[in-house]
């Protein structure tokens, strides 16, 4: 009620996901209202997630801020607490050229040299889409291992999956929009990252099991 992050509730929620059989968590993303959180608040959140989840869940921490300095600070901190990967949307508000977005992402990635990097494509909110030319540029970064795709055309999943595999051999694509989970998995998404998964994890775990079982 005082507007502060509750470490106890962060830990309890993380344990809840473990108890439900969830395989991984995406921290400080859209559902976590990352844009409205300060750097120190986001550090507190990921520290308390890792206190419970380390070694039990795959943890991806979203580190993007609207300035590179804060994003780099969060990337370094993420690596120090042992996350499995960091993720980032492009800078928002001003539409930057692709070379600037690539420089932003690569600078963040370089700040966590031993940690995988996930591109977060959400053009309807970020204002910038992940084009194939920008994607190809990011494939030069050895730490880029996945895309979380929240664009509305579901076929983008197939496009990024095919291009990623061609560039790297193995490449992960996560379906973003919750309402497209089944369609996304059916056309090649390796998993899903979304908001309602945290509210009803049993449903989505069951759907994922049935899809995998054919």
Residue ranges, per PLM feature:
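Active-site beta->alpha loop and helix N-cap motifs at the rims of alpha/beta catalytic domains
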Residues: 1-129
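Catalytic alpha/beta core domains of metabolic enzymes, predominantly
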Residues: 111, 123-214
